[in-house]
Design a protein with these regions (language model features):
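Conserved PLP-enzyme active-site core in the AAT-like
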Residues: 2, 13-17, 78-195
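A broad "ordered helical/assembly scaffold" signature
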Residues: 25-28, 37-38, 67-70, 94, ...
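Conserved N-terminal alpha-helix of the aminotransferase class I/II PLP-enzyme fold
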Residues: 38-87, 112-119
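Generic alpha-helical propensity signal that fires on short helical segments
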Residues: 30, 43-48, 52-54, 73, ...
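Generic structural signal for well-ordered, non-membrane alpha-helical segments
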Residues: 5, 23, 59-63, 110, ...
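N-terminal "arm"/small-domain region of PLP-dependent enzymes with the aminotransferase-like
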Residues: 1-60, 68
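Short, basic and Ser/Thr-rich N-terminal targeting/leader segments
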Residues: 23-24, 75, 124
Length: 195
């Protein structure tokens, strides 16, 4: 997001370039798939040699605009959009963890996140240990060689407890583990965990 724009202006006005129809707001692309110039164009697109839309379930102009807008508001380098918060959490953790790893999570997390940690991760030999938000200073004692991620929500769901992100970030950096934050309530207007 351009520093010349206030946050609110950027949130509303950052959008994809206008088409030849000069629409005021972005057009909705309600298509399942996109066309290609020829077989070679299609092959190169599927091989990700070209940045072209293939299927809307992967990307389309609206999805790209949404991701670009959130990335700008969050102060991130890049991002992905998911259909739900749990899809984002599962995809993120699934991409970063492997059998034998440990997640160190705040005890206060969304019920479905807790179910992921207690019902599904054990099937894949991924362990989850918990720390209390009120006693976050003791988190370092829980970090082990197999700890790959510190996970937390802030504000928590449903308790709305607030974590010190800079504190957690410093611990994660010190121990070479990733910090994953679910920012479900605060939105980038109030809190930017990435920045």
């Amino acid at each position: 997001m351009s520093s010349k724009k206030e946050f609110e202006t950027g949130a509303i006005r950052n959008q994809m370039p206008r088409s030849g129809y000069s629409e005021h707001t972005s057009a909705m692309y309600l298509t399942s798939s996109f066309v290609f110039d020829d077989a070679e164009d299609m092959r190169a697109s599927f091989a990700e040699e070209k940045e072209k839309n293939i299927y809307s379930r992967f990307s389309n102009p609206n999805n790209t605009e949404f991701v670009d807008k959130v990335v700008a508001m969050e102060g991130a380098e890049s991002g992905y959009a998911f259909a739900s918060g749990m899809a984002a959490i599962f995809s993120t953790l699934g991409a970063l963890l492997e059998s034998g790893d440990q997640v160190l999570s705040a005890r206060s997390v969304f019920g479905s996140t807790h179910a992921l940690f207690t019902k599904f991760f054990p099937k894949w030999n991924i362990e989850t240990s918990y720390f209390d938000i009120a006693e976050a200073a003791g988190i370092e004692a829980l970090i082990r060689p197999e700890t790959k991620i510190i996970f937390a929500e802030t504000p928590t769901n449903p308790g709305l407890e607030i974590l010190d992100l800079e504190f957690l970030g410093a611990i994660a950096k010190k121990h070479g583990v990733l910090l994953v934050i679910d920012n479900c309530f605060a939105t980038p207007y109030l809190q930017q965990p990435i920045a």
